[in-house]
C-alpha cells in the first residue's frame, strides 16, 4: 500500500481497530497469566529467587528465536502470524492449567510471544505512515497498558480467590485473542521470497543486527528501549518482594495493583509523547528516562501506600513518554532498511538480552540475601546513570556529525 494512500486513511481505520483489539486480549492474557503463575509457584513452595527465573525462561525464548521470527513476520500476512502466535500462548496456558510444569508452560507462552511481537509492531508500519506512526504506537501502547492494568489486577485478585479459576480465565482470554485476529484484514507479505533455511535466516538476521546497530539513530533507539524494558520487568518482580517488606502486606493482589499504577501512568505518558514528540524531536524523551531512575530510588524508600501509588503513576508517565518515540523511530527507520519485522526482532533481541541480564542479576542478589529496599535504591541509581550516559553519548554523536564538513 502506497504511503500517499496510507496518509489519506484515518488513523482509526478498520485495520487499526482490529489490531488494537487483538493486542488488548493477547496482552491481557500475558499479564493475568504471569501473576496467576507466580501465585501457583508460591503455593507450590518454590523459593523466592525462582520467581524471576519464570520470566527468564520466557525471555530466553525471544533470544533463541530472534533470528527467525522477524522473517516469519515479514514473510507472511502479519495478522495470521499474530493468530498462530496467540494459539501457542493458549497452548502454554493449558499446559499450566492441566497441572504440568509451570516453567515449561510459561516458556511455551514465551514462544508465542516471541513470534507475536514483530508482527504486532511491524503491522503498524503497513497500515499507517509518517507522523501517524507515532500516534499509532501511542495507541498500541495505550491498548497494551490497559490490558496490563486489567490483566495484572485480574490475575492477582482471581488467584487470591481461586487459583484454577484464574488460570482458566487466562486460557479463555487467549482463545478470544485468537478469534479477534481473524478480523485483521489479510495484507500482502512485506518481504516474500527469502530463504527459509535456518542458516540463511540466521545470517540474514545478524546482517540486520549489524545494519541497525551501525546506524546512529536506530542504535540510539535499540539501546534506549533495551534499558527501559529490562528495567521494567525487573521492577515488576521487585514489587512482589518489596510489598511485604515495605507495606507489610502479603497477598497477591497488592503487587498487581501497584503494577497497575505504572500501567495507568504509561497510558498518560504515551498520549503525551504522541502529542508533543515527533520523529524529528525524539531526543525530547531522554530527560524522562533519567527521571525514571530517580523516581524508582525515591519509591524504594517509601512505606506509605498513597505515596507508593503516586510515585508509580509518575514512573509510568515518564516511561510512556520515554519509550513510545523510540519505538516509532526504530519502526520508521527499520521499515526502509531491513524490514519492520526484522527491525522489531532485532529490538526484541536487545530488550530480552537486557531483561535476562537484569533479572539474572536481581535473582542473584535476592539469593544472596540483599535487603529488597537496598536493591530498589541501587536499581534506580544504576538506571538513571545508564540513561544519562546514553544521553551524553547521543549528544556527542550529534556534535561529531555537525562538525563533519559537507
Curated annotation (Swiss-Prot):
The chain crosses the membrane at residues 16-36, 53-73, 91-111, 139-159, 164-184, 227-247, 253-273, 285-305, 310-330, 349-369, 372-392. The keyword Signal does not apply. Its main location: membrane. GO terms for cellular component: plasma membrane. It is found in: Cell inner membrane. Keywords: Cell inner membrane, Cell membrane, Lipid transport, Membrane, Transmembrane, Transmembrane helix, Transport. The keyword Membrane applies. Pfam families: MFS_1. GO terms for molecular function: lysophospholipid:sodium symporter activity. It comes from the Bacteria. It is a multi-pass membrane protein. Catalyzes the facilitated diffusion of 2-acyl-glycero-3-phosphoethanolamine (2-acyl-GPE) into the cell. Belongs to the major facilitator superfamily. LplT (TC 2.A.1.42) family. NCBIfam families: PRK11195.1. This is Lysophospholipid transporter LplT.
Amino acid at each position: 500500500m502506497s504511503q500517499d494512500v496510507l496518509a489519506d486513511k484515518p488513523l482509526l481505520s478498520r485495520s487499526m481497530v482490529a489490531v488494537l483489539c487483538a493486542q488488548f486480549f493477547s496482552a491481557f492474557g500475558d499479564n493475568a497469566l504471569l501473576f496467576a503463575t507466580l501465585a501457583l509457584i508460591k503455593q507450590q513452595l518454590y523459593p523466592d529467587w525462582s520467581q524471576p527465573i519464570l520470566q527468564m525462561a520466557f525471555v530466553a525464548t525471544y533470544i533463541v528465536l530472534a533470528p527467525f521470527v522477524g522473517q516469519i513476520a515479514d514473510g507472511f500476512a502479519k495478522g495470521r502470524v499474530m493468530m498462530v502466535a496467540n494459539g501457542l500462548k493458549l497452548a502454554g496456558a493449558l499446559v499450566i492449567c492441566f497441572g504440568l510444569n509451570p516453567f515449561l508452560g510459561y516458556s511455551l507462552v514465551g514462544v508465542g510471544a516471541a513470534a507475536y511481537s514483530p508482527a504486532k509492531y511491524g503491522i503498524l508500519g503497513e497500515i499507517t505512515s509518517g507522523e501517524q506512526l507515532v500516534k499509532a504506537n501511542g495507541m498500541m501502547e495505550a491498548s497494551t497498558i490497559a490490558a496490563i492494568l486489567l490483566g495484572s489486577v485480574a490475575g492477582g485478585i482471581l488467584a487470591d480467590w481461586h487459583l484454577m479459576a484464574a488460570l482458566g480465565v487466562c486460557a479463555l482470554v487467549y482463545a478470544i485473542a485468537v478469534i479477534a485476529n481473524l478480523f485483521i484484514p489479510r495484507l500482502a507479505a512485506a518481504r516474500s521470497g527469502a530463504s527459509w533455511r535456518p542458516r540463511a535466516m540466521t545470517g540474514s538476521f545478524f546482517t540486520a543486527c549489524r545494519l541497525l546497530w551501525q546506524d546512529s539513530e536506530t542504535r540510539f533507539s535499540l539501546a534506549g528501549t533495551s534499558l527501559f524494558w529490562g528495567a521494567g520487568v525487573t521492577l515488576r518482580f521487585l514489587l512482589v518482594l518489596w510489598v511485604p517488606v515495605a507495606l507489610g502486606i502479603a497477598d497477591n493482589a497488592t503487587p498487581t495493583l501497584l503494577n497497575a499504577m505504572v500501567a495507568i501512568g504509561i497510558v498518560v505518558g504515551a498520549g503525551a509523547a504522541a502529542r508533543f514528540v515527533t520523529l524529528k524531536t525524539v531526543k525530547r524523551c531522554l530527560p524522562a528516562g533519567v527521571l525514571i531512575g530517580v523516581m524508582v530510588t525515591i519509591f524504594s524508600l517509601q512505606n506509605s501506600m498513597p505515596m507508593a501509588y503516586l510515585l508509580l503513576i509518575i514512573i509510568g508517565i515518564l516511561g510512556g513518554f520515554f519509550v513510545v518515540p523510540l519505538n516509532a523511530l526504530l519502526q520508521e527507520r527499520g521499515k526502509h532498511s531491513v524490514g519492520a519485522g526484522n527491525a522489531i526482532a532485532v529490538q526484541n533481541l536487545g530488550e530480552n538480552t537486557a531483561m535476562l541480564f537484569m533479572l539474572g542479576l536481581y535473582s542473584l542478589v535476592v539469593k544472596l540475601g540483599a535487603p529488597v529496599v537496598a536493591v530498589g535504591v541501587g536499581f534506580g541509581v544504576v538506571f538513571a546513570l545508564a540513561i544519562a550516559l546514553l544521553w551524553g553519548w547521543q549528544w556527542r554523536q550529534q556534535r561529531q556529525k555537525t562538525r563533519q564538513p559537507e
